[in-house]
Amino acid sequence: MGKISGSGTVAPHILVIFGASGDLAARKLIPSLWDLFEQELLPRTFGILGAGRTALSTESFRARLAEAVTKHAVRTPHDPARLTEFLQKIHYFSFDPTDSVAFADFATYVRTLDQSLHTEGNFIFYLATPPSLYETIPTQLAMHHLNREQGNFRRVVIEKPFGYNLETAQHLNASLRAHFQENQTYRIDHYLGKETVQNILVTRFANPLFEPTWNRTHIDYVEITASESLGVENRGGYYDQSGALRDMIQNHLLLLLGIIAMEAPAVVSSSRLRDEIVKVFDCLRPMGERDVMQHTVRAQYVAGKIRGVAVPGYLEESGVDPRSCTETFAALKCYIDNWRWMDVPFYLRTGKRLPTGVTEVIVHYRTLPIALFEHIERPCAREGNALVIRIQPDEGIQLKIDLKEPGAGFKTIPVSVDFQYSALTYSHLPSAYERLLLDCMNGDNTLYHRDDAVESAWRFIDPILAAWKSNKSPLLTYPAGSWGPKAADDLIKGSAPRWHHPSSTLLSDDFACRL
């Protein structure tokens, strides 16, 4: 089973989770902390303090989390005594974080717990809360002097969405800077914690096979797809205020674009890596209204079938305004105006209720100027070589090339050279939250967003949102279970007949045309 290694000995501390009675803590945070505990990567002197409005005792909170660990952890608990040892590190405090008097009581409790656990005044404050509290909680922490570092550390972790647009992101950054230094602030994007995302850097910069050809001379175009077969589930109210562009492209897909397109840093360090990603964002070609009309597609799913099961349309989902114009599908054609990538199109696509749930990057290489060999036409074959980087699921890399078909003549057939993480000696990759939580504990913010990166991404997205709001690009529809509206295929036709349609398994990806 996969194991991650820390960058050093983690100092004693208390991890405070605001919104601890919510879904994120139960499904991701606590199970990931258990996995770190099982690998003996947590310090012996360590505590978890859950904080939330829900009235719970510490014992009832622990009982909830025991069930969550059993259900969601990568490493299923087999030793009841070991699980009990972990649960004994967990505490709970019920209060309203918007109430200053209640927050004073909470601050007193935190300091008392710190003294009893001997955690040396070190705190990580994780905001697993609605975005409406992203300004309130850090302000309250500062009012009660829980932000000050005096030979110890105080860090704050903030989930996405970080802002609703450029203006709100800048306001939130300014508010945070008033109370926490940038090196105390950790803006989390779980995509950066995925092994396959980090492996893009190694694939590019550790292999002379790829880096010399990673440019406009050899690469024709790049596709980045994050498809979901699920609908909005129980997040209808949140999603209706967000949409696919804000929810996925502004953060996850632009991040993947940044890593694919960045220059090699002089050294692998937090500041250098993040500098290069910001440079990519700053070089994104701005979109005016005409560009938005020509280079973007937005759509909303209507009733259809997913793997033969009927599902409702978006407007029939719980919590969604029946008159909503929120997009559940978004596709962009964008350019990076720098020496390496000038005029190479990057196609970004995301959507809900698509045939399968897959995130992958496909780098398409240019065809040769002269075709010496006869190519066998296959309904799903693509001209040219391609590198498929599968982020999730069935993580791996696939290099698509042409070889000679056995027999007389020189007819070529498309084949693939594959690597899958499942082929390694361990059976499970560490979860993204395992890696990111451990990095934060070690004070390593390499895989967290910096303030200027967030603002640069919003600076690119804002004009698209504005044009969509004024209906410069129509809101289309697509049946659930399809790959989106026809206009999305029209968007990519300048580079290919259609998008690369991912399969649920890497080895049957696209050439086999199986979903």
From Swiss-Prot:
Gene Ontology CC annotations of this record: cytosol
Binding site for substrate: 190, 194, 228, 247, 352
Residues the entry annotates as binding NADP(+): 53, 160
Alphabetical list of SUPFAM superfamilies matching this protein: Glyceraldehyde-3-phosphate dehydrogenase-like, C-terminal domain, NAD(P)-binding Rossmann-fold domains
Pathway noted in the entry: Carbohydrate degradation; pentose phosphate pathway; D-ribulose 5-phosphate from D-glucose 6-phosphate (oxidative stage): step 1/3
One Pfam family in the UniProt entry: G6PD_C
GO molecular function: glucose-6-phosphate dehydrogenase activity; NADP binding
First-tier enzyme category under EC: oxidoreductase
GO biological process, one term: pentose-phosphate shunt, oxidative branch
Catalytic site: 252
Spans traversing the lipid bilayer: none
Similarity-based family: Belongs to the glucose-6-phosphate dehydrogenase family.
Its job: Catalyzes the oxidation of glucose 6-phosphate to 6-phosphogluconolactone.
Protein name: Glucose-6-phosphate 1-dehydrogenase
Annotated source species: Treponema pallidum (strain Nichols)
Organism placement in taxonomy: Bacteria, Pseudomonadati, Spirochaetota, Spirochaetia, Spirochaetales
